[in-house]
UniProtKB/Swiss-Prot annotation:
NCBIfam families: PRK13430.1 (NF009967). It is found in: Cell membrane. It comes from Bifidobacterium longum (strain NCC 2705). GO terms for cellular component: plasma membrane; proton-transporting ATP synthase complex. The gene is atpH. It is a peripheral membrane protein. PROSITE patterns: ATPASE_DELTA. One of its GO terms (molecular function) is proton-transporting ATP synthase activity, rotational mechanism. This is ATP synthase subunit delta. F(1)F(0) ATP synthase produces ATP from ADP in the presence of a proton or sodium gradient. F-type ATPases consist of two structural domains, F(1) containing the extramembraneous catalytic core and F(0) containing the membrane proton channel, linked together by a central stalk and a peripheral stalk. During catalysis, ATP synthesis in the catalytic domain of F(1) is coupled via a rotary mechanism of the central stalk subunits to proton translocation. This protein is part of the stalk that links CF(0) to CF(1). It either transmits conformational changes from CF(0) to CF(1) or is implicated in proton conduction. Belongs to the ATPase delta chain family.
């Protein structure tokens, strides 16, 4: 968990630079890729992270380190983002890499906006999450620390070679397995789904069922939960064959479990409570 100083630094930096990053439009693709590369470099070097976050070191020295790291090939916006980040105070050295990754995802979302692909990417990430839920062996290999990042990316491409995914979906999915960042693969995909949902100004409603939802069911769920939360919602449909009947619905931290298993568990608890002597 990030400390207070890091949370403030991340939020203020992204808020202040969001308009400029958004205005880069299709250049945001290049910027996002550069930021993902920098995230990996930082993750691989605690010494570099410390050099860029040392509060006793002048900002000018940190910028000099950045210029040596990035050279003359980085997009000006990438350099501006990194300069802003190294000028801020961080709770822990490694938190700066988290902020760089956040900016990278932001850039990819702005590129999706510029190419009218935001909703498509959000849906594809949800479908990817659902598909991998039923592929435990593949899922485990996608966050196997013993395998090289190249091997994990190659596996992802082989498994999903038959799907025509948007380039943003592909890049985000590959980033998630290329640079694991101490996360399970599906955790990262769910994190990305949530970020896209917030970016689109919607609430994410995750619905888990044994079989895929029909279009009519999704439409009805959108109507019901949009009215309930007071704003448009996006349905994240998850297929889990182990679910026995009914639906498990999650909105934020609130879970409504109407599956057969949940109802049996509730009945069992009720019977036990009633059977307990007063």
């Amino acid at each position: 968990m990030r400390g207070e100083a890091s949370r403030i630094a991340d939020r203020e930096s992204r808020d202040s630079l969001a308009p400029k990053l958004r205005d880069t439009r299709e250049d945001a693709w290049r910027i996002g890729n550069e930021l993902f590369t920098i995230t990996k470099v930082l993750d691989d070097s605690i010494q570099l992270e410390r050099a860029l976050t040392d509060p006793s070191r002048p900002v000018a020295d940190k910028v000099a380190v950045l210029k040596e790291l990035l050279g003359d090939n980085a997009h000006p916006m990438t350099m501006e983002i990194m300069t802003d980040l190294v000028s801020r105070r961080w709770s822990r050295a490694r938190d700066i890499a988290n902020a760089v990754e956040d900016f990278g995802v932001d850039a990819m979302m702005y590129y999706a906006d510029a190419t009218d692909a935001t909703l498509q990417v959000s849906i594809e990430l949800s479908e990817l999450h659902s598909a991998l839920l039923n592929l435990p062996v593949v899922r485990a290999k996608l966050y196997d620390y013993q395998a090289t990042s190249e091997a994990r990316v190659k596996l992802f491409r082989e498994v999903f070679s038959g799907k025509t995914l948007n380039k943003v979906t592909m890049r985000l999915a590959e980033h998630a397995t290329c640079n694991l960042r101490r996360r399970r693969y599906l955790e990262t995909i769910q994190w990305l789904i949530n970020k896209f949902s917030r970016h689109m100004g919607e609430s994410m409603v995750t619905v888990t069922t044994a079989t895929p939802l029909k279009k009519e069911q999704i439409k009805r769920l959108v109507e019901v939960y949009s009215a309930k939360v007071g704003r448009q919602v996006h349905i994240n449909s998850v297929v889990d064959p182990t679910v026995l009947g009914g639906m498990r619905i999650q909105v934020g931290d609130e879970v409504t479990d109407n599956t057969v298993v949940a109802q049996l568990q509730n009945l069992h608890r009720k019977v036990q409570t009633e059977a307990t002597p007063a």
